[in-house]
Amino acid sequence: MQNILFVYPKFPVTYWGFQHIMPFIGKKAAFPPLALMTIAAWFKEGFNLKLVDCNIEKLRDADLQWADYVLTSSMIVQKDSLHQIIARCNQMGKPVVCGGPYPTSSPERFKAATSIVVGEAESFMEKFVEDIRNNRLLPLYKIHGDKPDLSLTPKPRFDLVKLRYYTSMLLQFSRGCPFNCEFCDIIEMFGRTPRTKSPEQFLAELDGLYDTGYRGKFFIVDDNFIGNKTKVKAMLAELIGWQRRKGFPFQFYTEASVNLAQDDELLNLMTTAGFSMVFLGLETPDENTLKQAGKNQNTRHSLEESIHKIQNSGLEVTGGFIVGFDSDPENIFELQKTFIRKAAVPFAMVGLLMALPQTQLTRRLTREGRMRPEESTGNNQNLELNFIPVRNQQSLVEGYRQLFLDIYHPKNYFGSCRELILNHLPRK
């Protein structure tokens, strides 16, 4: 029997980490590592499996000593923790495999790893598992040809994680997004033709989690849940029946594009199925900047009215906002502050523009000689830029810092909460 250790690197303090609120609610992390739980499902007979999430517990030397192979999955924001894990594996002579968005976008940074997985793994996972079984691991596994059918994805191994330590569970229904935002890395990794699981497959995964006894919040992690509206409507119709039969054990939230506001049927299906919140990439209230960034879907209707339409349906809107675009007007910080207040989006992720690897933005800035040599941190809230901005950098960073302080000043934050509750969310 071979021992396979799955290790999830630690997140720094970011918007998505929620580290400072965990002690208040008796939890240790927001979400379990879905990718590793899914990869683990391919390892069946002949393997002992263990998963260590460094966000809820320490990776001990004893864990590494136990392992025959160490498998990791990471995003770029986890890079510091990941490279520490790789170094420890090397020191102890343990083969370490690195996959996920970070190695996919920056494979050149993984010379210390035994093997890297670039891209989606479904197409070659059976070979990968057999190579581990036979101790003949290749240095690189990479997708060739078409992107994989999600019907190949197995049910995640929720039994490998300590469910009680997380605020929310998560599953994936689709990959890819039909839009073409210049700064986005999702369309580079997953493509612009959304691929989905079948309703039956997705509900079977829900059954697997339901059978663990978990009840509560549930994040559907799709980068654009409504990328294929026909498929998502069919799934939601089945999900409504499932929720009713089970007594509505899960409260869902997800990420979507703002054109959700123009589809009353979809809004009704989502709220009926038990969705209570949606994260939207709002980016900026400046229409010219949206067009320059390729975010044309945000310009076809009033952004503020679209947000209120979604809120009035019963979905709280949380949003992502960006400053640092080339075409930002001089008064962008005041525009953002006013828009966030009027739109009643208290839970706003405001960040500096970041040029992520292998994006249209990075390619353009490279051609213009504006990329800095430093690797992107993946954290757009640490007051650093990995490119030379049009605006004076000191002015940009200070304006961003003040914007952040303004929108999260208690008076402004709770004012937005009050506006949302009293004037936009429906009364029940």
Language-model features: locations:
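Radical SAM [4Fe-4S] cluster-binding motif and immediate context
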Residues: 152-318, 325, 329-338, 366
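Radical SAM enzyme core and accessory elements
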Residues: 2-6, 13, 45-51, 63, ...
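Conserved beta-strand positions
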Residues: 6, 72, 220-222, 280, ...
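Short, solvent-exposed turn/loop segments enriched in Gly/Ser/Thr/Pro and often Arg
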Residues: 55, 102, 223-227, 256-259, ...
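Structural recognition of alpha->loop->beta junctions
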Residues: 108-127, 269-277, 335-350
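Acidic, low-complexity intrinsically disordered segments
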Residues: 2-214
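Mobile, glycine-enriched helix-loop/loop "lid" segments at the mouths of ligand-binding/catalytic clefts
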Residues: 143-148, 360-383
